[in-house]
Amino acid sequence: MTSAQKPVFSPSDLQTWLEIATEAVLAAGAEIFSLWGKVQQIQEKGRAGDLVTEADRQAEAIILEIIKRRCPDHAILAEESGQLGQVDNPFCWAIDPLDGTTNFAHSYPVSCVSIGLLIQDIPTVGVVYNPFRQELFRAATSLGATLNRRPIQVSTTASLDKSLLVTGFAYDRVKTLDNNYPEFCYLTHLTQGVRRSGSAAIDLIDVACGRLDGYWERGINPWDMAAGIVIVREAGGIVSAYDCSPLDLSTGRILATNGKIHQELSQALAATPQWFQQYAAARAQKI
């Protein structure tokens, strides 16, 4: 997804791509909604708990048809189909046809369609649609962020102890000690609460529109976060690596906040190992 030659595009191009992504998420969202409660095929994709249904596949097929027809020269990175097109193409669509598949498979209505356009690996256009709440989030670099065509902004919460956060847990959480459990425990102590939706894209848009103040997670893929990153940034938030350095999509780690608690949340994540060691020792003495 890299290129030595800098791609050339205009604000009107961004608007066009935004409309293409919107067309695709709405069409896929309608398909997902029509299959609600009717899923018959649920499979695991090689990792325990990593599910795929016919809704994922059918929604992705709809999106791919639209993107390929409207942007035939662009590459695609889709959750179910993988990499399509040349790896070094500077324009690459990152597609999650159904983010929150496990929720969907259990008839828990917290899922969405997420489509982001990466330009030289930088999330530049993002659209997320939640068909169960009929919420359409859109953003493009320098064009702002909207919810159902109305501008949105991140929250104004200025301290971690007043914040409401959200996180998630990777599919390999049972097999690794780097599973986000200590961070979840520590941040629960430091904040007004930590939620878990089961959809990275929904977590990001909830930060973007001010429902939540911050989000962190490990073990996620570019298609999980590409669209949401643009939306958070255009809503006035900050997205980075855990240590506040520039985000690298390939690491699978992301920190996104309203900006006001960003440094404090980053410091808390860094302090987690020491806190958890002390907490575990103290708990062992009491049991």
Swiss-Prot record:
Mg(2+) 1 binds at E79, D96, L98. It comes from the Bacteria. PROSITE patterns: IMP_1, IMP_2. The keyword rRNA-binding does not apply. GO terms for biological process: inositol metabolic process; phosphatidylinositol phosphate biosynthetic process; signal transduction. It comes from Synechocystis sp. (strain ATCC 27184 / PCC 6803 / Kazusa). CDD domains: IMPase. Its EC number is 3.1.3.25. One of its GO terms (molecular function) is inositol monophosphate 1-phosphatase activity. Disulfide bonds: none annotated. Substrate binds at E79, L98, D99, G100, T101, R195, D224. Its cofactor is Mg(2+). Mg(2+) 2 binds at D96, D99, D224. Coiled coil: none annotated. This is Inositol-1-monophosphatase.
